[in-house]
Amino acid sequence: MEIILYANLGALPHFNPDLDGDTPPPTVLELRAEVGLAEGLLICSPEYAHGIPGCLKNALDWLVASVEFPGKAVALLNTSARAIHAQAQLTEILTTMSARLIPEASVTLALPNQSADGAGLALDPEFSRTLRSALLALAQAIER
């Protein structure tokens, strides 16, 4: 499985349906193209003030009317056991958008400590086991 990080959430313009005509902004076209090429999506979001960050909601708003998103296999990764509101909001939003949520691939991965980097997280057996299981479930769902 190849995982490609989409790192341009902040470059997307604020959603405006008037701009979503025949020629949407280039960054929106790029987002839609990347989503279209993906066999599945892995969404990991922090929780701010009991909700998802505005930049993530903005990106999802740009995907609502796109043909690339409906039916896409989606796994949700929650990195805080206490962050239940963002996870619930994402589930509601993505269901409304006709995503194919994969419950067995949607897990809570409590970060062992704030200073852990990718290498440190990989050394944590529980974290690695849970992440590996979620990715395997997503891969299996994509193959179905």
Regions found by a protein language model. Name each.
Residues A49-H50, A83:
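Glycine-rich nucleotide phosphate-binding loop and flanking beta-alpha elements
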Residues I3-H14, A65-V67, S98-G118:
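Mobile beta-alpha loop/short-helix "lid" or hinge segments that flank ligand
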Residues K72-L111, P125-R129:
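Short, glycine-/small-residue-rich phosphate/pyrophosphate-handling segment
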Residues N58-S66, E92-M97:
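A glycine- and small-aliphatic-rich helix-loop capping segment at beta-alpha/alpha-beta transitions
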Residues M1-S45, G51-D61, L121-E143:
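N-terminal beta1-alpha1-beta2 submodule of the flavodoxin-like/Rossmannoid cofactor-binding fold
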Residues A38, G71-K72:
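Short coil/turn connectors at secondary-structure junctions
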Residues P17, A65, T79:
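Short, conserved catalytic or interaction motifs in soluble domains
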Residues Y48-A49, S115:
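Active-site beta-alpha loop architecture of Rossmann-like, nucleotide-cofactor-dependent enzymes
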